[in-house]
Amino acid sequence: MRFKQPSRRDRPVMFKRSKNVSVDVGVDSISDLPDAVLQHIFSYIPTELAIRTSVLSKRWRHVWSETPHLSFEWLKVSPKLINKTLASYTASKIKSFHLCTRYSYEADTHHVNSSIEFAMSHNVDDLSLAFRRCSPFYNFDDCFYTNSSLKRVELRYVDLMPRCMVSWTSLKNLSLTDCTMSDESFLEILSGCPILESLSLKFCMSLKYLNLSKSLRLTRLEIERISYIRAPMLSMQIVAPYIHYLRLRDSEAHCTFVDVSSLTEANVDVSTFHPRTCYHDFDPLDPHDLLVMVQTMLKTFQKVEKLTLGVNLLQMLSLSKIPSLPLPMLKVKTLTLETMIIRSVVPGIARLLQNLPGLKKITVYTTNPCNTEVEPCVNSYLDAQDLNPDQWWRLDDVVFPISSEYEVLKPEIMASFMELLLANTRTLETLVVELGSCVARSRFKELFQIALTLSHDKKVSIMLKRSNG
């Protein structure tokens, strides 16, 4: 198959103003725009700024009051002023309402309640409430849980404890970040969202059992969890028989999938390891436990056709005792690797590819070094136990750098990585490599020629991409 060099169409285009073009600064062409266009422009800026623009033109003075998109940041605007602003609002329908505040229980509860009630009474479609970290968290009135117009809700730093029946009959998208709720309370919320399609849970650490078996239309699930330094990590069981797409960033792989039988696309990595590996208040994490976790997780992905794995999970696959824990054969056709090109991911990638007999396409996104890699955390544990790290890692290929040496890669190292991918696949048709900045621009042509030869010899279409930086 042919290997094509990136076209000029992928390069940034620069425009220069002609010396012969004059600009008449005295013409107010914006004021001639229809109200709907001006309101659309206002929807991209905070409401406070939109109001201030009224001094620029009498024509604009009342345009903001009918814009369907309202956005308030209480870091700069007082609660009293926001409610005064809302009193001047004249439109009957709000499409989106965003409110961010450093919530104070004593001083702000009344104003927050008034603002939310205002949005709800105007049949808001998209509601976003971000309460900066505070104690206690904001707790909603009962009326919040009954609304037929809401289609999307995004909440941060709130307590969700409905004392009434939840009825969000139009809600399709629910996103919760740093929210506190019990398993029972969240189940009540889900029961009131009959057409929910997408659910995002970030750092909602109080949830232990996520039962989505009655959410028949829920097809997208995103979960992000983190283990706090001075608290042990709690596991979460997930029952989600109808989801098609999963994005998971889990701390130490503590999510257990009871049922994800409809899953066809997964994007998975392990986020952090520090509390149990770098602090001694808890029992240290045995590397063998990591192997069991990743094996158990992959077993639940046997119907997945599109799979994305991150650098930490790939390093977990590279631990030397993995042969004693056989990996399942997967039906993945499209594989994406988000990784650094380092020695500690190479064995894991090779082993993974050998268990993907129907693989057609690989996409590699090269990433920058991070502070939560498995290799240094596991080594820290092994050193504390007077164990030899070499007995745990299968790092035979010294061609690739270790993480502490990771900088700009030589073309021959990147070529060796591509050869590794091709050598461990039999049905591959396409290889895409997003280089980012890991290969110097001055040596891109050299790598291009190497890839051209590989493409011809292996009968695989290879595409190289790099950032404009």
UniProtKB/Swiss-Prot annotation:
Mapped LRR repeat ranges: 30-58, 178-203, 204-214, 223-250, 296-321, 341-366
UniProtKB keywords: Leucine-rich repeat, Repeat
Stored Pfam families: F-box, LRR_At1g61320_AtMIF1
Domain F-box: 27-77
SUPFAM superfamilies: F-box domain, RNI-like
Keyword Cell wall biogenesis/degradation on entry: no
PANTHER family: OJ000223_09.16 PROTEIN
Name the record gives this protein: Putative F-box/LRR-repeat protein At5g02930
